[in-house]
Amino acid sequence: MTIRSPEPEVKILVDIDPVPTSFERWAKPGHFARSLAKGPSTTTWIWDLHADAHDFDSHTSDLEEISRKVFSAHFGQLAVIFIWLSGMYFHGARFSNYEAWLSDPTHIKPSAQVVWPIVGQEILNGDVGGGFQGIQITSGFFQIWRAAGVTSELQLYATAIGGLVMATLMLIAGWFHYHKAAPKLAWFQDVESMLNHHLAGLLGLGSLSWAGHQIHVSLPINQLLDAGVDPKEIPLPHEFLLNRDLLAQLYPSFSKGLTPFFSLNWSEYSDFLTFRGGLNPVTGGLWLTDTAHHHLAIAVLFIVAGHMYRTNWGIGHSLREILEAHKGPFTGEGHKGLYEILTTSWHAQLAINLATLGSLTIIVAHHMYSMPPYPYLATDYGTQLSLFTHHMWIGGFCVVGAGAHAAIFLVRDYDPTTQYNNLLDRVLRHRDAIISHLNWVCIFLGFHSFGLYIHNDTMSALGRPQDMFSDTAIQLQPVFAQWIQNTHAAAPGFTAPNAAAATSLTWGGSDLVAVGGKVAMMPIPLGTADFLVHHIHAFTIHVTVLILLKGVLFSRSSRLIPDKANLGFRFPCDGPGRGGTCQVSAWDHVFLGLFWMYNAISVVIFHFSWKMQSDVWGSVTAKGVSHITGGNFAQSATTINGWLRDFLWAQASQVIQSYGSSLSAYGLVFLGAHFIWAFSLMFLFSGRGYWQELIESIVWAHNKLKVAPAIQPRALSIIQGRAVGVAHYLLGGIATTWAFFLARIIAVG
């Protein structure tokens, strides 16, 4: 008898035409909720509409329908991203000096925005060099285009049109997969298939296609650009693709074709797949041959990873088996039950993804300056500062979002009866120990980090510098960080004998890469000032985590409110007659967590901005390196007064004195954003009753004049007021910082 593997069963994974397409719904705001569909009777309606429009859980309890809406919305999100990208590329094609910058990136500044002189604001068009008048941009697009091998504005036009085509496709896909062929719930829950496709397809083939583009297009074009060839003389991408001899002139191993690949002599390809380390001295960026090698390696890893999970063929890993086998001697049932959670609660899934993505985004921020990936990025200080700040803020918001969705999962999706003695249950049962220990850590870090600063300010004020904690008095050197730096700096000759240079110049040594007389990257020394600020970082991060984690762990119940789960994710208080129960909802913890996230990230970007200007960025002359602020960080950052005087006040002079110059828009934004920030306090420090009384008085006046509105005005609810408050607080604070940073660094960098 013959034994055959079982036939893979054919599953029907879509429903055809589940929801009719109708434009009439567009004319009925709030059609998704019975209470909202009636239309507005009070002004609260518009706030509830915004709060619930994307809260698909509140529209229906059918998980399949929720999943389809989320899936469809993702295509809409991608369409918006493609339209935005297309706009960036169009600006590069139509309003930029990209071709001029490409021919002289060390003297000409990037600009892709030209202000039209409608009411005399053409003063904003500064001279960026090469006879071009425009606003200096700090997005890094020019550098990424150069790294990708873009040599003309026509290519940017073509890509901009391609972006619009892709956006159209995404919008059609979003409609198609909700109205025409909507996936069944089983398709959304098929985690093994999803892992295989996302790992091998998205990450694996995505990296492979980028590696292919780098090898066949970017490397030859950048090699010629680095050698000083005029961009107009460089062959077009398709010529490199179609004519192997052109490539072989630059990378001789191309003449051998695929023979070395199939004969396993892969080292033959080492002319374009390198392992150099360090930075290209011409551009100040990573060697593009290193990054091509890196993406090829990543592609191989992820394509292999995308074949690990069991689908129709009965071989490979099963996620459920992995999770249920994951038990330790002290962890009860281990991860049993988590599979069900992660396949039925998209909030739980989203919380993990946001926490991971947020952490990765912050890691990206730190690599963008220490290992600058694109040509001429490292010497464009405005772009370096912008990219670091941007990725830090994004990471902070993602991490707070993780706390929000973890709490929503516990309130809406968690079923305690199915989770007995697994890790989640055990964490929830000893939450008091977790939170009280974390609270102790926060108190310790807060008093000690702040205490060191208060000591220094007091000694400085009393004229006793010899009794301060500083590099020139009582030293508190960050010895562990210095040990890590030295280990990495010594690696090339020691633990990594094949590496020509350390992974980053920041680790130490004597190397300095300068491009056009500007420092690209050099060793970053750490001292007492960094030790002090580091502990402020530790403090603010731990407090943010304390607030978010307390919100998550006590989202279903607490000693104060044992039935909290019944009150939902957001509620103002536990009903009338129970004093002292306001601001305890999971939503309120997210609200408070946002302020501490803002604190934490602000200290990080201030530290980065000042440290780089003091110890890294600057010009190289015959006498040595002249840093922008002359190395004043080590002495001044050891007191709070030093931060206020030598960082905030000293460096705000550019934005405050920007009127009458091309930077004046930053002066206006600095003022306006301060106003938005202050406006937020009106919402955060006021009571609802105060506004309701005022509104009723104003309505009385309208009634007197017979102009009373049909929709009855209402004061914002407590939670709506706090949401408006925190939104303006963050918007005002971030925009103020943005104007302060850019006016400063564009003026001096």
Swiss-Prot record:
It comes from Zygnema circumcarinatum. It is a multi-pass membrane protein. Belongs to the PsaA/PsaB family. It is an enzyme of class 1 (oxidoreductase). [4Fe-4S] cluster binds at residues 573, 582. It holds the Pfam family PsaA_PsaB. GO terms for molecular function: 4 iron, 4 sulfur cluster binding; chlorophyll binding; electron transfer activity; magnesium ion binding; oxidoreductase activity. This is Photosystem I P700 chlorophyll a apoprotein A1. The PsaA/B heterodimer binds the P700 chlorophyll special pair and subsequent electron acceptors. PSI consists of a core antenna complex that captures photons, and an electron transfer chain that converts photonic excitation into a charge separation. The eukaryotic PSI reaction center is composed of at least 11 subunits. It catalyses: reduced [plastocyanin] + hnu + oxidized [2Fe-2S]-[ferredoxin] = oxidized [plastocyanin] + reduced [2Fe-2S]-[ferredoxin]. Keywords: 4Fe-4S, Chlorophyll, Chloroplast, Chromophore, Electron transport, Iron, Iron-sulfur, Magnesium, Membrane, Metal-binding, Oxidoreductase, Photosynthesis, Photosystem I, Plastid, Thylakoid, Transmembrane, Transmembrane helix, Transport. InterPro entries: PSI_PsaA, PSI_PsaA/B, PSI_PsaA/B_CS, PSI_PsaA/B_sf. Its EC number is 1.97.1.12. It comes from the Eukaryota.
